[in-house]
Amino acid sequence: MIKGIGIDITEIERVKKAATAHSQFIQHVLTPTELEQYSQFSGQRSVEYLAGRWSLKESFAKAYGTGIGANLGFHDIEIIDNQYGAPIVTKSPYNGNAHASVSHTATLVMTEVILESENK
């Protein structure tokens, strides 16, 4: 059974500006494992990855029902690409299944997270 759906659209340039303006922005958003994956990219692809993780975590927080804040932080959620590049939620406070999807244009990233209970 679906427990929550979260959708987010983020401007890639906005995330790029935040990362440039705030020296700890990337470390604030990405877990150490996500940072490892991020470090494998360069140029526009690294910005897309960062914006994608920001947006995926926002989508997760919306599906979870709390938003990002006092009860749920960016490091409480970890989303790693599998060998095919699909985002997989590897860490979260949610005990059921979490399904994630991400898509980019040249300027935007759109994400969706669906939280599903283990009992169908």
Swiss-Prot record:
GO terms for cellular component: cytosol. Mg(2+) binds at residues 8, 58. The keyword RNA-binding does not apply. One of its GO terms (biological process) is fatty acid biosynthetic process. Its EC number is 2.7.8.7. Keywords: Cytoplasm, Fatty acid biosynthesis, Fatty acid metabolism, Lipid biosynthesis, Lipid metabolism, Magnesium, Metal-binding, Transferase. One of its GO terms (molecular function) is holo-[acyl-carrier-protein] synthase activity. It catalyses: apo-[ACP] + CoA = holo-[ACP] + adenosine 3',5'-bisphosphate + H(+). It is an enzyme of class 2 (transferase). It is found in: Cytoplasm. SUPFAM superfamilies: 4'-phosphopantetheinyl transferase (SSF56214). Its cofactor is Mg(2+). Disulfide bonds: none annotated. Belongs to the P-Pant transferase superfamily. AcpS family. Transfers the 4'-phosphopantetheine moiety from coenzyme A to a Ser of acyl-carrier-protein. NCBIfam families: acpS (TIGR00516), pantethn_trn (TIGR00556). HAMAP family: AcpS. This is Holo-[acyl-carrier-protein] synthase. It comes from Limosilactobacillus reuteri (strain DSM 20016).
